[in-house]
Regions:
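Solvent-exposed beta-hairpin/edge-strand motifs
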Residues: 305
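Amphipathic alpha-helical segments in well-structured domains
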Residues: 61-65, 240
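The substrate-binding groove and active-site-proximal loops of carbohydrate-active enzymes
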Residues: 10-26, 49-60, 121-134, 167, ...
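Aromatic- and carboxylate-lined catalytic core of secreted/periplasmic carbohydrate-active enzymes
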Residues: 142, 231-267
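Substrate-binding/active-site clefts of carbohydrate-active enzymes
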Residues: 1-41, 68-74, 91, 112
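Surface beta-strand/loop "capping" patches
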Residues: 256-287
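Conserved alpha/beta catalytic core and glycan-binding cleft of carbohydrate-active enzymes
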Residues: 33, 65, 69-70, 78-224, ...
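Active-site groove signature of glycoside hydrolases
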Residues: 30-57, 159
Length: 305
């Protein structure tokens, strides 16, 4: 830690830039924002790391992101701004700052608790939340209510990423990290069935399914740095890759899974069911899709209303 200048959370290797007192810096960063979404580079947008931590005050933070958005959208109106954020993003999603977020609170975390009973770092197990369909829907409703519909529909829905344990490892329902458990333990006791359930939900829940490289090939790993293992060239799980291809195809063929409204249809101990619905007035015409997930070991019969 560092006590001679302001670092992000005190880390000397991550100095915080002084936007408040440096107009030149401020404009320089806005120029970078415009450059990479413009020709000839044509980036599709920006992923903004811990975006709420920028600046020294909330007022400065919000003003910077308003100006950043204006610069980006002027250069490329179709460019997207996705913020990494923990907690409610409500104050940033009013149409003048971020477009959406990496969807930890309204996708990754509730899904992980429901399907595995594990927190997204594999640091904590809560058996009471494993398979609790009612708790899953309650968490989703609460966190989705903090975002406008447009932001929900394009939120970055991940099962894993570089900062958290691989979802495949969470299916072993074991608390651990690289230093305490070792790399091999991340690959032991995993469940391909539970993993496939996660993929099904990722491809049918509102938002933008975002596959962290290697998830589709069966890569395991505890939280950072173990979750950043190299892609297993030549050793991919081809059946899992094909399953991702199959579920992506279902999402592509059913417009309701991409753009439709959401309705919880059933929930209880060990199961959920939800529907996605689209009216005839939308592109692709009227359609609907129903997803049912059973976390138990026995067959289950549901009456879908």
């Amino acid at each position: 830690f560092n006590d001679s200048y302001d670092g992000w959370w005190g880390h000397a290797t991550l100095p915080k830039l002084n936007y408040e007192e440096s107009p030149e810096l401020y404009q320089y960063i806005l120029g970078i924002a415009k450059k990479w979404v413009s020709a000839p580079f044509g980036a599709d947008g920006w992923r903004l790391d811990v975006a709420a931590d920028l600046g020294r005050s909330a007022g400065m933070n919000h003003q910077f992101w308003r100006d950043f958005r204006a610069a980006v959208k002027e250069a490329n109106p179709e460019a997207v701004m996705i913020a990494e954020h923990y907690g409610s993003p409500y104050d940033w999603l009013k149409g003048d700052q971020w477009d959406t977020v990496m969807n930890y609170d309204a996708f990754m975390e509730p899904l992980s608790w429901f399907l595995t009973g594990m927190e997204k770092h594999s640091d904590e197990e809560n058996p009471a939340l494993f398979g609790d369909g009612c708790a899953f829907f309650e968490a989703m409703r609460y966190h989705m209510s903090e975002m406008p519909t447009a932001s929900v529909q394009c939120a970055m829905n991940e099962l894993s990423n570089h900062d958290h344990s691989r979802f495949m490892t969470r299916t072993n329902r074991r608390v651990g990290r690289l230093a305490s458990a070792g790399a091999k333990a991340a690959e032991e006791g995993i469940s391909y069935g539970i993993f496939r359930q996660g993929v099904v939900m990722q491809m049918t829940w509102p938002g933008a399914p975002t596959i962290y490289y290697g998830d589709e090939a069966g890569v395991c790993g505890w939280t950072d740095p173990d979750s950043r293992r190299t892609y297993p060239w030549g050793g991919e799980n081809l059946e899992l890759i094909e399953f991702h291809r199959y579920m992506s195809g279902i999402r592509k063929r059913c417009p309701a899974f991409r753009n439709g409204s959401l309705k919880a249809l059933a929930a209880g101990d060990g199961y959920i069911a939800y529907g996605r619905f689209q009216s005839a007035q939308r592109a692709g015409g009227a359609c609907c899709g129903v997803t049912a997930v059973n976390t138990g070991d026995d067959w289950l019969t549901l009456k879908i209303p």
